[in-house]
Swiss-Prot record:
Domain SH2: 148-245
Lipidation sites (N-myristoyl glycine): 2
Residues that bear Phosphotyrosine: 416
Any single Pfam family the record assigns to this protein: PK_Tyr_Ser-Thr
Binding-site residues, ATP: 273-281, 295
All residue ranges annotated as the Protein kinase domain in the record: 267-517
Annotated family: Belongs to the protein kinase superfamily. Tyr protein kinase family. SRC subfamily.
Substrates-to-products reaction catalysed: L-tyrosyl-[protein] + ATP = O-phospho-L-tyrosyl-[protein] + ADP + H(+)
Record's keyword annotation contains Kinase: yes
Name of the featured protein: Tyrosine-protein kinase transforming protein Src
Native organism taxonomy: Viruses, Riboviria, Pararnavirae, Artverviricota, Revtraviricetes
Amino acid sequence: MGSSKSKPKDPSQRRCSLEPPDSTHHGGFPASQTPNKTAAPDTHRTPSRSFGTVATEPKLFGGFNTSDTVTSPQRAGALAGGVTTFVALYDYESRTETDLSFKKGERLQIVNNTEGDWWLAHSLTTGQTGYIPSNYVAPSDSIQAEEWYFGKITRRESERLLLNPENPRGTFLVRESETTKGAYCLSVSDFDNAKGLNVKHYKIRKLDSGGFYITSRTQFSSLQQLVAYYSKHADGLCHRLTNVCPTSKPQTQGLAKDAWEIPRESLRLEVKLGQGCFGEVWMGTWNGTTRVAIKTLKPGTMSPEAFLQEAQVMKKLRHEKLVQLYAVVSEEPIYIVTEYMSKGSLLDFLKGEMGKYLRLPQLVDMAAQIASGMAYVERMNYVHRDLRAANILVGENLVCKVADFGLARLIEDNEYTARQGAKFPIKWTAPEAALYGRFTIKSDVWSFGILLTELTTKGRVPYPGMGNGEVLDRVERGYRMPCPPECPESLHDLMCQCWRRDPEERPTFEYLQAQLLPACVLEVAE
């Protein structure tokens, strides 16, 4: 991916301002420049493709006008048809006395699967019995048990995994097709000097007789046979299949069975990662076994009763692009225990050493991940209230996840609840939310537009040179930030859609996610 060269324009023509023409603007950005297209040595290589200009209902970044289906990347299937023998997809080390350790490939007899995310299982290898995470296993002799089968992961996630520059040509996975029910898709990494590393997708169709094929001249009775054949012969594919796409273990749903309100003594705070107005963030260990992130809140920040009630809702929000809430210590000082993200906050990541290597394709991809998580929040009728780069966390391979959703409304600090106090993030907040307290998913959309400027400026504070009071006044009178340097006009226009005065005229996160799809992926038969 890359950006298109913008025609020289007067900077005033690059703004989506609603101010009168004679208004004085502060902190304007210079006109767009062509970004450096040299990919960083430790980031995904992507072919250079141009960003199109905006038209009515545009496909800004090579995407569709409808979003990808977002599903959890769990590969394990539920018990069906009386199947009780499962195979382990990953290694698992027990975290409590009631857990069962097992190795990848181990066969397990499910004793009782009515326990939600944790099933009681008996190992046919060790003879031991205990609870296991249900998303770490799949029915024996099923397609889900194949290492190359990734199930309902999105097309976008398959591309992110395959575009790792360490993957050799021909690295592949099989997933469910998002466009045709009952069909599958073979996704394969390819490379050439003109396009660089790219991904090709081949639809696997199903015969009425039960067989499978990519081209009708070569048919197979099973997906396993299809994969075995194309591992030996390219036969029309971009390359023969070489390596199964590597992937990391999924997060378990919770720390363990019945581990929600946990004792403070079960947590060890080890490395302080950051500090804010309302508390600290630590890397730590739960129960001496499990790496976690721990957010400690200063006493008085919020009511423990209100927090626990909100946390019950938050823990039900599960999506691959949301930081998972694992457990809580509900007595003051409140502790919030979540999955650990190794690269810290997006804001620090952008401003740090790695930020200088990020190019526009990676930044757009990160924006798309955030939009994906927020599209789920949107579907769940939830509101974040504090969406900004400081509340996005980064993991390995530039994975981004939305954090701290819903906590903002519980804060009781006067400097925050006044909405114009020193601690309130006024520069990220929609006018109707800042002035009248009307926080909705549409005010989150406004904040996402501001977050896009943080991405494209590598963490620069929005509205440079302006104080909070001036920002609120100018925005209310129609001012909108101009296009940042090296940002394509099409992306700036997307920001401006997020900053429309009428909240109902702002786009949905589903729409934003679709517009931010990568232009680096080549379409083949899907």
